[in-house]
């Protein structure tokens, strides 16, 4: 399914010669949240109108599997989970992982929830099961329904490494593990007891690909997750979207050429115009 996003890459730079043709463009894959980035890059680097660019992503875990199995040349993803790193090791594949754009990990609640800010410790307590009621963190007397994501999804890997940092997460109830970014947003947004749900995802996805009026992003430790706060590092639950290739790609390979184009000045301009936070 195609996802429509509000920050579209629309204008090709007429002063910029295409680097690739549609025929020799490397086979790319990636996560849901990097699909617009991949489309923007392919449009810019081939000199093709965005509506004529066909890119499909098979989501984070499958993208890693495809790269390891040489079914794709470059993937745009979050950092590999321990399981994905082990898969590569078992296959004798060394991964080259390069940050392309900045990203932040964000938490959201229904707009009717009175809470606007949580500390990182409070979030850890909620997801470890230590805190179970909103009144314990300054909200109303309602049980917290803390949504999780499936293992090996980009969001779950981010939650474990960036937020929990070794603290064991409580076992999720099966109905609270959303199967995709869209699912987790829908459940938090439309849950009947509107004050009691919390979810998490990546900033770009929530603000650009899934702008849904019924949710609000929470400040963490008093800092709002805004574009500027992410770019400056003030909002510090940060990661990146990475371009990953097999390390044995030759210097003159198209995969390596594409990677270098993504982190070039022009590549970063393309990323910014597509709504992502520049890394360089």
Regions found by a protein language model. Give the residues of each.
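Exported/periplasmic ABC-transporter solute-binding proteins
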Residues: 1-87, 93-103, 108-280
């Amino acid at each position: 399914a195609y996802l429509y996003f509000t920050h579209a890459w629309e204008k090709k730079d007429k002063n910029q010669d295409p680097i690739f043709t549609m025929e020799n463009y490397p086979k790319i894959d990636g996560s849901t949240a990097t699909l617009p980035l991949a489309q923007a890059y392919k449009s810019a680097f081939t000199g093709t109108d965005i509506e004529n660019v066909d890119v499909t992503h098979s989501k984070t875990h499958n993208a890693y599997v495809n790269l390891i199995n040489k079914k794709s040349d470059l993937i745009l993803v979050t950092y590999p989970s321990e399981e994905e790193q082990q898969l590569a090791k078992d296959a004798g594949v060394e991964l080259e992982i390069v940050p392309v754009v900045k990203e932040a990990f964000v938490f959201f609640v229904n707009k009717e929830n009175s809470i606007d800010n949580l500390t990182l410790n409070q979030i850890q307590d909620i997801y470890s099961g230590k805190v179970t009621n909103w009144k314990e963190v300054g909200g109303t007397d309602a049980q917290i329904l803390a949504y999780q994501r499936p293992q090996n999804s980009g969001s779950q890997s981010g939650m474990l490494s960036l937020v929990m940092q070794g603290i064991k997460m409580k076992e999720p109830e099966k109905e609270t593990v959303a199967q995709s970014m869209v699912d987790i947003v829908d459940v938090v947004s439309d849950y009947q007891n509107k004050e009691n749900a919390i979810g998490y995802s990546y900033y770009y996805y929530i603000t650009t690909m899934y702008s849904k009026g019924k949710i609000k992003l929470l400040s963490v430790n008093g800092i709002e997750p805004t574009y500027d706060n992410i770019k400056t590092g003030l909002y510090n639950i940060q990661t990146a979207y990475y371009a990953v290739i097999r390390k044995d790609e030759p210097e003159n390979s198209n995969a390596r050429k594409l990677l270098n184009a993504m982190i070039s000045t022009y590549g970063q301009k393309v990323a910014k115009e597509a709504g992502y936070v520049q890394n360089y």
